[in-house]
Amino acid sequence: MNIVVTGATSFLGAALCKELVSRGHQVYAVVRPGSSNRQVLEKLENDSHFHMIFRNLEELDQLDREISVECPVYFHFGWDGSGSENRKNPKVQGKNVLDGMKALEGARKLGCKRFLFSGSQAEYGICADTMGETRECHPVSEYGKAKIAFGGKATEKVRQWNQTGVCRMEYVHTRIFSVYGPGDHPWSLVNTCVDHFLQGEEMEFGACTQLWNFLYIEDLVKGLCALAFCERAVGAGTDPEESGIYNLAGEAD
């Protein structure tokens, strides 16, 4: 199957590309021109199943100029300011929503049947108990607000397309919780702890009053693939004919 992955050099995107290639799919990995993270994909560059496309996020509606085949599955992971101070920047996060809608339009042009977006647990806001897909969202960060805003706009656009016969597409909104594993930022909590412990050093923590959910990167990728290739991606809290919301997280006790 022909599959598009934006944000392909990210922690999640790179792992997904590797898994899809290993399964024999033709992967079109969208990378920003001059990306400093391109090296995370270097082991795939000589594989006949892997194709690197250089485009900025605001150009994602133009991928049909470089990809000449239909791509039934499209993963949109491209997002500015995911792990930086720009998570708080409304201008940066607002542009992500606009760029995401361009990605959706670009996917339509490529004959996409299932569009999968990397949402976040940040959409729920501050919660003291289990976060289920039907829980009302009260995002606090600009990052979380933008993720949920894009989900609403994309769901409505796909509904319009399906109702008017423009195309038939499913929009799948994944809410990804904390992920760890090879390729994660060296300053992440898990990596920092492991580095300290391996060197016999102590690690300073706060009061440790929060219960937090972590999922291994390989398990996340398997979950994403399950959503991409299942017969029908029906989720909770949305129109089952068109969309689905899925939490991707570790098992909850």
Where do the language-model regions lie?
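N-terminal Rossmann NAD(P)H-binding glycine-rich loop of SDR-like oxidoreductase domains
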Residues: 3-23
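Short-chain dehydrogenase/reductase
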Residues: 93, 140-151, 187-188, 213-214
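Conserved Rossmann-fold NAD(P)-dependent oxidoreductase catalytic core, especially the SDR/UDP-sugar
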Residues: 74-76, 80, 101-142
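Glycine-rich Rossmann NAD(P)(H)-binding loop
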Residues: 6, 178-183, 204-212, 236-253
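Active-site Tyr-X1-5-Lys
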Residues: 140-172, 198
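Flexible, glycine-rich beta-alpha linker
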Residues: 124-125, 141-142, 172-189
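NAD(P)H-binding glycine-rich loop region in Rossmannoid oxidoreductase-like domains
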Residues: 54-95
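Alpha-helical substrate-binding/gating segment
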Residues: 191-203, 214-246
